[in-house]
């Protein structure tokens, strides 16, 4: 078994053989995915740091992993004694600046071409240019050092059940081609896997939690080529591609195909790996912009939203069963760990119709663990749920008819007045945005302040964004919209009818507890639009169906309108979920949706 020290030695030997002064190994794949197949988990394997995001840098005599504050504690433990330094992003210079400072003039930096985007390479090059430091792509180096490297995944590709699809692949391609024509593009290269899955109406299981498949898609004016291995397509998928006018070529041949084109190529530079463009003729003109399909797939049809509502009902019923079982065990003196919560949730969800998988790793954090917004319990490091405290559960699932993502906080034992105060502040923030009416096309970062106002008034805040887009039986995180005051507003953030977005304010007390209340919501046109000169307005239709624990609400802090919102929401939750529950789950649902009174 290779140790990190063995890997470091092997990396440095390989670097020396190739004339490299430094090697950069990012958390990335050729599709710039959030979740990576094992084949591209080189940073995790070679550094020993298992967090989901980080950048590993090796020089002749130094090594470091750059991680953000979510992972400082984890990285400190995992890197201890390895010869790799923890570099705390935000407190130290970024890795590109560190390289520029620490490397000599005319040095060579290696980075695998399939693990860096065009934008990423440009940013790195800009930092290194003053010292004339060149960038090279040692694409065989990782394979030689990582002898047990897993193969590129090639799981079966299948169609998205036509009962849940409201637009054919051919119709989607026609919409993309219309945008290509507007921009003067002869081709578009699509590298992001959720865009490809959406455009083809196909799904897969190559990537954990995301129903996508490793591939590229090259769209021409009158043809389209899907780069994936033909043998992994089931009969229905192969027939569907033929019907849509798409041909199939091997995954590895995308760069060869691009070497044969001419004219203008539309790409999204921060979603396109350098490896795909290495043989692109110099005569080809690049047109850069966000993938047209990113905008199209963010707007769900009425039929899509109807299916999402149904998925939410099944998800909510599963949660009722889970919480009923959880409370019964805890109230009767039983013992559960954070790991048990994950296992129980999966069991209840997997019994529901249309369930495919979880949509991300469940976050179950008790007390101080919940103060880490992206905490993940492991068999080696987790807490037992006992005594008094707060349990935060952020979880979700993939169903044929939609993707779910929900966060709830429940008390264990007797909550304190401070815990109820914090929870009520978060609830007030959630309600403020959930009830908002806003102009269509407003830039999504601009509405974040609506949510944060109740917390700001109490001189509280949270460090993460308030909302992200959610796919339709696709990735739980998608764009282009993002509700986050830290985001620089741009035209890509325009809020459109049919978008599905999370609303998830939080409040975190390090070492004590964390609170987050998350529902998904769809942008809908207001019921009675006013015919005025001010344009069209939207509101949020709450999609998620699960009680919010009233035991943590301080009604003295709430307005009559906020209490009314809770009661209307709980009445809808009960109405929709009661027919889908029975026994203990139904009893729990009724108990937790009793009207809130002062």
Task: Enumerate the language-model features and the residues they cover.
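Active-site neighborhoods and metal-handling regions in enzymes and metal-associated proteins
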Residues: 1-598
């Amino acid at each position: 078994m290779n140790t990190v020290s063995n890997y470091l030695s092997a990396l440095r030997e390989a670097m020396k053989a190739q004339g490299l002064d430094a090697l950069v190994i990012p958390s990335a794949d050729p599709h710039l995915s959030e979740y990576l197949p094992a084949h591209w988990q080189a940073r995790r394997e070679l550094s020993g740091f298992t967090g989901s995001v980080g950048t590993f840098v090796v020089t002749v005599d130094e090594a470091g992993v750059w991680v953000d504050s979510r992972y400082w504690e984890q990285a400190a433990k995992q890197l201890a004694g390895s010869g790799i330094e923890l570099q705390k992003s935000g407190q130290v210079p970024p890795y590109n600046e560190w390289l520029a400072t620490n490397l000599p003039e005319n040095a060579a930096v290696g980075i695998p071409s399939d693990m860096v985007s065009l934008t990423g390479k440009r940013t790195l090059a800009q930092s290194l240019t003053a010292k004339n430091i060149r960038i090279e792509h040692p694409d065989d180096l990782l394979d030689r050092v990582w002898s047990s490297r897993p193969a590129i995944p090639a799981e079966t590709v299948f169609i998205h059940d036509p009962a849940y699809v409201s637009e054919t692949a051919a119709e989607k391609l026609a919409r993309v081609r219309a945008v290509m024509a507007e921009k003067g593009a002869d081709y578009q290269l699509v590298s992001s896997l959720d865009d490809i899955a959406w455009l083809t109406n196909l799904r897969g299981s190559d990537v954990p939690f995301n129903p996508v498949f490793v591939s590229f898609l090259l769209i021409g004016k009158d043809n389209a080529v899907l780069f994936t291995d033909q043998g992994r397509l089931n009969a229905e998928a192969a027939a569907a591609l033929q019907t849509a006018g798409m041909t199939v070529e091997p995954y590895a041949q995308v760069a060869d195909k691009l070497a044969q084109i001419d004219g203008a190529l539309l790409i999204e530079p921060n979603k396109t790996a350098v490896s795909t463009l290495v043989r692109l003729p110099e005569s080809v003109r690049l047109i850069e912009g966000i993938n047209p399909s990113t905008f199209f797939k963010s707007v769900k049809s009425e039929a899509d939203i109807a299916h999402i509502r149904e998925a939410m009902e099944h998800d909510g019923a599963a949660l009722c069963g889970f919480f009923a079982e959880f409370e019964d065990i805890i109230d009767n003196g039983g013992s559960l760990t954070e790991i048990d919560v994950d296992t129980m949730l999966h069991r209840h969800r997997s019994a529901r119709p249309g369930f495919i998988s979880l949509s991300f790793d469940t976050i179950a954090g008790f007390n101080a663990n919940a103060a880490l917004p992206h905490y993940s319990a492991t068999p080696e490091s987790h807490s037992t749920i006992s005594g008094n405290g707060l349990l935060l559960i952020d979880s979700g699932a993939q169903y044929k008819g939609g993707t779910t993502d929900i966060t709830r906080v429940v008390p264990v034992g007797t909550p304190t007045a401070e815990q109820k105060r914090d929870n009520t502040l978060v609830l007030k923030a959630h309600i403020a945005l959930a009830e908002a009416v806003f102009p269509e096309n407003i830039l999504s970062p601009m509405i974040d302040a609506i949510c944060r106002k109740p917390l700001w008034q109490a001189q509280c805040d949270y460090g993460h964004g308030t909302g992200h887009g959610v796919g339709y039986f696709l990735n739980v995180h998608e764009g282009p919209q993002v509700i986050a005051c830290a985001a620089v507003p741009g035209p890509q953030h325009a809020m459109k009818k049919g978008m599905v977005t999370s609303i998830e304010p939080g409040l975190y007390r390090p070492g004590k507890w964390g609170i987050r209340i998350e529902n998904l919501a769809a942008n809908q046109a207001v019921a009675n639009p006013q015919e005025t000169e001010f344009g069209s307005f939207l509101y949020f239709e709450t999609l998620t169906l699960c009680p919010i624990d009233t035991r943590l609400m301080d009604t003295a802090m709430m307005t009559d309108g906020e209490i009314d919102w809770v009661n209307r929401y709980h009445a809808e939750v009960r109405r929709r979920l009661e027919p889908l529950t029975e026994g203990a789950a139904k009893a729990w649902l009724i108990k937790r949706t009793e009207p809130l009174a002062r």
